[in-house]
Amino acid sequence: MRIILFGAAGNVGSRIANEALSRGHTVTAVVRKTDQLATLSEGVLGQLGDAGDSALVAKLSEGQDLIISAIRPSEGSEHLLPLLTKSLLAGAAQANKRLLIVGGAASLEIPGEKGQTVLTAPGFLPPSVLDIARACAEQHNICRENTETNWTYISPPPMLTPGIRTGQYRLGSDQLVVDENGQSAISMEDFAVALIDEAEQPKHHQTRFTAAY
């Protein structure tokens, strides 16, 4: 499979690239800055571009089988996430390509909390991450309202950290997947496994799923 990946220089994006490469897929990473090309994993094809340009997204996606977005704006630029998402959705629709979006946990419901989400539950999130959480919730709403693009939104659990690849995970839809201790977590490596599994064997179309241990 030929995959074009936006956000490949990030923590999650780099692991998605590595997982895809390990399975024999071809990965083209789109980055905004020349110096980011040197940070890409060996075997990843580098391409300069901007996810905010929907026409360019469509053009770069020509000859590709799948678009993946793992974009996460830096602190202070969280407001860009919804705008970039709209551009990616438009570009994917124009190119007639499937789009997998790494989103956030903000809109996931907390089991037993009467519909409260990670974002709305009082005190669940520290103030330092509220801006990106709000942006991710808006991002999810933008996807839900889109009927023109073959999109899939993948929400990580609240605890998404570097770790090891076990190949194990459990899937959910709109609620947090929690373990016997009430924790919802997964390593970035296994989150990448879940995403590439979905890329290879599509089961979610114009909907969201989540993966955790």
PLM feature segments, named:
Residues I4, T34-A95:
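NAD(P)H-binding glycine-rich loop region in Rossmannoid oxidoreductase-like domains
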Residues I3-R23:
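N-terminal Rossmann NAD(P)H-binding glycine-rich loop of SDR-like oxidoreductase domains
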Residues N146-T147, T161-Q168, E198-T207:
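Glycine/proline-rich active-site loop of Rossmann-fold NAD(P)-dependent oxidoreductases
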Residues T34, K86-D131, C136, N141, ...:
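Conserved Rossmann-fold NAD(P)-dependent oxidoreductase catalytic core, especially the SDR/UDP-sugar
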Residues R2-A9, K97-L99, D174-Y213:
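Mid/C-terminal beta-alpha module of Rossmann-like enzyme folds, strongest
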Residues T26-R32:
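Conserved glycine-rich Rossmann-like NAD(P)H-binding loop of the short-chain dehydrogenase/reductase
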Residues N141-P162:
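Conserved beta-loop-beta element that borders a ligand/cofactor-binding pocket
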